[in-house]
């Protein structure tokens, strides 16, 4: 409906909303970006990959559920995506499930408490580059001072310097589990991949973190990072949910989460 467009009409005045030249169920293109959706099958699992090419002044952004920062503020990925006119969105780090871990969104420092010294975060800088940091090595304020636009605190890093970064210690426990996954990666300074793999469904067994990292390497990313998975894992594109979100392993339904990463 037209009722919601009033809230976001301000975005059009920035000159970033452009008329799409391509807009289908698997492809989108306008003056600033092109996005294509492909589905792969690996390890008996469907993996949905959105390849983003930046052509103009578009950038990866984040949005909070209900435009509000808080521990108990959640909404479905698709709901938050629609509220910011996202073409492509994935669930973020679900910062609200934890009371520590750096949170920087669209350049705003929202949480500076460190989860622990070894916590690996993804930093997306103003120039579009990705970095992986450990919270023990740098403060959230220093990251913002260094040009961080987004800091996502989940992990682990999947690929660093083009190599698989998931080590054997990650393989104990959560890394071995096969479940839905969400990840983001950078190929070069204008090309990114948003990745969501299914799991716990009849069609998809699910990936371990090692398998996910190996798949990201196949996509030729230089840096890739694991975001919140399981029932949170959702990919939204051009008005539709692309994957099969599983709230409890049975229902195909979206989980409400704290935040999204989008264009």
How does the language model describe each region?
Residues 1-116, 120-121, 131-132:
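Zymogen propeptides
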Residues 28, 93-175:
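Active-site-adjacent helix-turn-beta-strand microarchitecture at beta-sheet edges
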Residues 42, 55-57, 95, 137, ...:
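Short, glycine-/Ser/Thr-/acidic-enriched flexible segments
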Residues 45, 57, 128-129, 186-193:
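Beta-strand-turn-beta hairpins that frame and shape the catalytic cleft
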Residues 47-51, 157, 183, 260:
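Conserved hydrophobic/aromatic beta-strand scaffold that supports enzyme active sites
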Residues 64-69, 136-140, 197-201:
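Short, solvent-exposed aromatic-acidic interface loops
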Residues 84-87, 129, 163, 189-192, ...:
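Loop/turn elements at helix/coil->beta-strand transitions in domains of secreted/extracellular proteins
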Residues 99-116, 124, 169-186, 191-222, ...:
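Conserved, well-ordered active-site substructure
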């Amino acid at each position: 409906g037209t009722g919601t467009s009033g809230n976001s009409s301000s975005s059009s005045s920035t000159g970033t909303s452009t008329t799409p030249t391509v807009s289908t169920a698997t492809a989108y293109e306008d003056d600033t970006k092109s996005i294509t959706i492909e589905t792969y099958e690996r390890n008996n699992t469907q993996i949905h990959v959105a390849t983003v090419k930046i052509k103009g002044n578009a950038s990866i952004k984040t949005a909070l559920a209900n435009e509000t920062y808080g521990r108990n503020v959640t909404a479905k990925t698709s709901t938050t995506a629609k509220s910011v006119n996202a073409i492509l969105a994935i669930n973020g780090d679900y910062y609200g499930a934890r009371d520590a871990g750096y949170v920087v969104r669209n350049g705003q420092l929202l949480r500076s408490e460190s989860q622990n010294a070894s916590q690996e975060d993804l930093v997306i800088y103003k120039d579009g580059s990705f970095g992986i940091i450990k919270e023990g090595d740098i403060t959230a304020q220093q990251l913002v001072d260094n040009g961080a636009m987004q800091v996502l605190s989940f992990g682990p890093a999947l690929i660093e310097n083009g190599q698989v970064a998931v080590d054997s210690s990650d393989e104990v426990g959560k890394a071995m589990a096969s479940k839905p996954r969400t990840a983001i990666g950078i190929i070069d300074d204008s090309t990114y991949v948003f990745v969501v793999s299914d799991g716990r469904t009849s069609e998809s067994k699910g990936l371990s973190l090692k398998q996910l990292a190996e798949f990201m390497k196949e996509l030729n990313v230089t840096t890739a990072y694991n975001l919140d998975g399981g029932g949170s894992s959702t990919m939204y594109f051009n008005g539709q949910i692309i994957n099969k979100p599983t709230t409890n392993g049975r229902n195909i339904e979206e989980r409400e989460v704290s935040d999204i990463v989008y264009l």
